[in-house]
C-alpha cells in the first residue's frame, strides 16, 4: 500500500554535542499525511534533530532515510528564515518555486501560474497587501509567514519546520498549522514541526516525539 510506505525514516539515530549525547537509539518513520510534532525542553536537541533529518548534520550513530520522490524531497523552515531583505515580499515567495523551473523559464519572470499560486498563498497568510513591500519593512510575524509561503511554493514532499509559528498569535498559529497540514496532505507528503504549545500539538499533530534533556535515551514517540 503506497500510503503506508514511509517517506522519512530514522533508525538508531544518535547525536553527540561536545561530550554529551543529545539523544541515542532514536527511531521513527513517517508516511504520507503524517504530522510529527517534536517537543522537549530547551537544549534537548530539537533543532539539531531537524538538521540531521535534512542531511545538513551528520549523525554520530544510526541513519536517516528520505524516501520521498520528486524534485524537492525535503523543504525546511528554520528560525533564521533566510529571506532576502533587499527583495520585495512577492519575490521572496516566488523564489521558492525556482527549483521546479529551468533558468531560461524564469529569465524573463515567473510563469503566470506560479504568480497566481504565490498570490493565493500570500492571501491565505494575511500578506495579500504586502507583496510589493520590501521584505526588510515587514514585522517578524509577517516575515515568518512569508518564509512559510516560500517553502510551500517549493512543494516539498517532506517539510521540516523549526518553530514555524513562534512569532504568531494563537489564531494565526492555528491557521498556519492548518495550512501546512492541508498543503502536505494535497501533495501526499509529511510534516515535521518543532512546537511548544501543547494545545497546538493535540489539535494538529498525528504523532509526537518528545526529547529529554536529562537522558539521551529518554525520548518517547506516540500517536496523538
Map each language-model feature to its residues.
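Conserved structural motif at the start of ABC-family nucleotide-binding domains
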Residues: 8, 22-25
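Helix-to-loop junction immediately C-terminal to a conserved catalytic motif
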Residues: 54
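Q-loop/switch helix immediately C-terminal to the Walker
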Residues: 86-105
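Conserved ABC ATPase "signature" region
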Residues: 106-130
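Conserved ABC ATPase signature
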Residues: 134-138, 142
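Catalytic Walker B motif of ABC-type/P-loop ATPase nucleotide-binding domains
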Residues: 159-162
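H-loop/switch region of ABC-family ATPase nucleotide-binding domains
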Residues: 195-196
Amino acid at each position: 500500500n503506497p500510503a503506508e510506505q514511509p517517506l522519512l525514516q530514522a533508525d538508531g539515530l544518535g547525536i553527540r554535542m561536545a561530550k554529551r549525547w543529545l539523544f541515542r537509539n532514536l527511531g521513527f518513520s513517517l508516511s504520507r499525511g503524517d504530522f510529527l510534532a517534536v517537543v522537549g525542553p530547551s537544549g534537548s536537541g530539537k533543532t539539531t534533530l531537524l538538521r540531521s533529518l535534512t542531511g545538513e548534520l551528520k549523525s554520530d550513530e544510526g541513519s536517516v532515510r528520505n524516501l520521498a520522490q520528486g524534485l524537492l524531497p525535503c523543504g525546511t523552515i528554520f528560525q533564521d528564515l533566510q529571506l532576502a531583505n533587499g527583495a520585495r515580499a512577492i519575490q521572496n515567495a516566488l523564489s521558492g518555486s525556482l527549483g521546479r523551473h529551468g533558468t531560461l523559464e524564469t529569465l524573463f519572470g515567473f510563469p503566470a501560474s506560479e504568480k497566481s499560486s504565490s498570490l493565493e498563498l500570500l492571501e491565505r497568510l494575511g500578506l495579500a497587501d504586502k507583496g510589493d513591500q520590501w521584505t526588510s519593512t515587514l514585522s517578524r510575524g509577517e516575515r515568518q509567514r512569508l518564509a512559510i509561503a516560500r517553502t510551500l511554493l517549493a512543494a516539498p514532499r517532506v517539510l521540516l519546520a523549526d518553530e514555524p509559528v513562534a512569532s504568531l498569535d494563537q489564531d494565526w498559529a492555528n491557521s498556519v498549522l492548518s495550512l501546512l497540514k492541508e498543503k502536505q496532505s494535497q501533495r501526499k507528503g509529511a510534516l515535521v514541526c518543532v512546537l511548544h504549545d501543547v494545545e497546538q500539538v493535540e489539535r494538529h499533530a498525528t504523532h509526537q516525539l518528545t526529547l529529554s534533556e536529562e537522558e539521551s535515551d529518554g525520548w518517547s514517540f506516540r500517536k496523538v
